[in-house]
Amino acid sequence: MSFTPGKQSSSRASSGNRSGNGILKWADQSDQSRNVQTRGRRAQPKQTATSQQPSGGNVVPYYSWFSGITQFQKGKEFEFAEGQGVPIAPGVPATEAKGYWYRHNRRSFKTADGNQRQLLPRWYFYYLGTGPHAKDQYGTDIDGVFWVASNQADVNTPADILDRDPSSDEAIPTRFPPGTVLPQGYYIEGSGRSAPNSRSTSRASSRASSAGSRSRANSGNRTPTSGVTPDMADQIASLVLAKLGKDATKPQQVTKQTAKEIRQKILNKPRQKRSPNKQCTVQQCFGKRGPNQNFGGGEMLKLGTSDPQFPILAELAPTAGAFFFGSRLELAKVQNLSGNLDEPQKDVYELRYNGAIRFDSTLSGFETIMKVLNENLNAYQQQDGMMNMSPKPQRQRGQKNGQGENDNISVAAPKSRVQQNKSRELTAEDISLLKKMDEPYTEDTSEI
C-alpha cells in the first residue's frame, strides 16, 4: 500500500483540491490544472510551465512534498548528521523516511544598480525512488544530492510514497524531529527567518505559517498563500542592500580628526602615489608651485583631484605603459635629505622622465581642456606678481579721505598747544608774563 504524506495511512489520495492539516501551498510549486495520468509509484514526471526556470538555473520537473531549504550564506555546506534530515510528514511511517535532498540552482536577476546577482541554491527533499534521481541507488555520489534516512528505514528498497500532484496535493511546511541540527547558513522556506543550528519541532512549526496568516501548524485550516513568487524575498533583500549601498556612498561629515587621519594616510604614501584632495592639498603633497612644478592655481590647489575640472584633465594622463615606453627616462642618485644624522642613511634615486602628451581639437571636451590648462599652467607667476605689487596705502584709524598727507594733524581739534605736542620759540610778551609771575604778590589798597 502506497503512502501519501499529509494523510493518514488508511486514507487514499483524492483527485480534488484539499486543504488538510499542516498543509500549505508554496508559490514555487504552484498548482496547475491538468489531468492526472497516474498515481502509482515512480510515475512519469509531469512538467509544467512553472517548473521551467528562465535566465539560467536547472529545471525542476518534479514537485517535492515539502517546502525548500534556501542557502543565505556562501561557502556553507549542506549536510545533516546520520539518521537526521528527513522531514516529518503525517501518514508516513519511520520505515519509509528515506530519500535525498536535491540542489536547485536558481536563476540570476538584475539588481537596482544594474548588476547581475546569482541567487544562492535551494534544496528540495524527495523520497527514495522518486524525483529527479528516482533510479539512483541510495548513497550514490552525485553532485548536488545529499542522501538522508532514519535509523528505522531500509535504504536498499525504494520508499512506497506517491508522487505529489500539485493540482490536488499541496506542499507541506518542512519540519524536523526534535534534536535535528540544521545546516549552518540555511533557512527553511516559510519560516520567516534563518534557522539556527538546533531547533525543536514546535519552534519550527510555529514559524511555518504563511505571510498572511497567524495560525499555527496544528490549526484545522490554513489559507494558501497567493501573489508570492519563489524569489521575492531574495529580490527584496537585494534591492534593500543595493539601496543601503547607495546611501552608504553619500558624503559624510569630515571632522578635524578624520581630516588629519586622511592627510597623514596620503602623506605616508610615496610621492608618486599621492592624490591631493580637500584634506591634503596640492602644496602639502608636492610643495609650493614654481618653475619645476608649474601646474595648479586658485581652487585647484585647494581641492586637488576633488576639483570638478580635474576629471577632464585626467583623460590626458598617460597610462603606465605610455609612461615607461613613451618617455625618455633617466636614473639618477640624489642626496638623502630626510631622516636624522644618527639614523642609517639610505640610497635615494630619482627616475627622471621627459615626454609629451599630444592631442588635437577633435578631442572630446577640447575647449574645456584648453580653458583649464590656460588657467592653471604657470598660475604661480600671476600669484607671485600680485603679492609683489606695492600694497594700497591704508589710512590710519580716525583718518578721513584726503587727509593722508597731514600725518601730524589729529582729526579732533586739540584743546591746547600742549596736546598738539608742538614746540615753538618764546615771544617778548611771553617773557614779560613770566617775569610778572616771579614777582611777589602785593595786595592793591588804592581806592577807586
Swiss-Prot record:
Subcellular location as annotated: Virion; Host endoplasmic reticulum-Golgi intermediate compartment; Host Golgi apparatus
Location of the CoV N CTD domain: 259-384
HAMAP family assigned to the protein according to its UniProt record, in alphabetical order: BETA_CORONA_NCAP
Swiss-Prot/TrEMBL keywords: ADP-ribosylation, Host Golgi apparatus, Phosphoprotein, Ribonucleoprotein, RNA-binding, Transcription, Transcription regulation, Viral nucleoprotein, Virion
Species assigned in the record: Bovine coronavirus (strain OK-0514)
Quaternary structure and partners: Homooligomer. Both monomeric and oligomeric forms interact with RNA. Interacts with protein M. Interacts with NSP3; this interaction serves to tether the genome to the newly translated replicase-transcriptase complex at a very early stage of infection.
Name this polypeptide is given: Nucleoprotein
Family: Belongs to the betacoronavirus nucleocapsid protein family.
Compositionally biased region (Polar residues): 29-38, 45-55, 399-409
Ranges of Basic residues composition bias in the record: 266-276
UniProt binding sites for RNA: R106, R122, R164
Gene designation: N
PTM annotation: ADP-ribosylated. The ADP-ribosylation is retained in the virion during infection. Phosphorylated on serine and threonine residues.
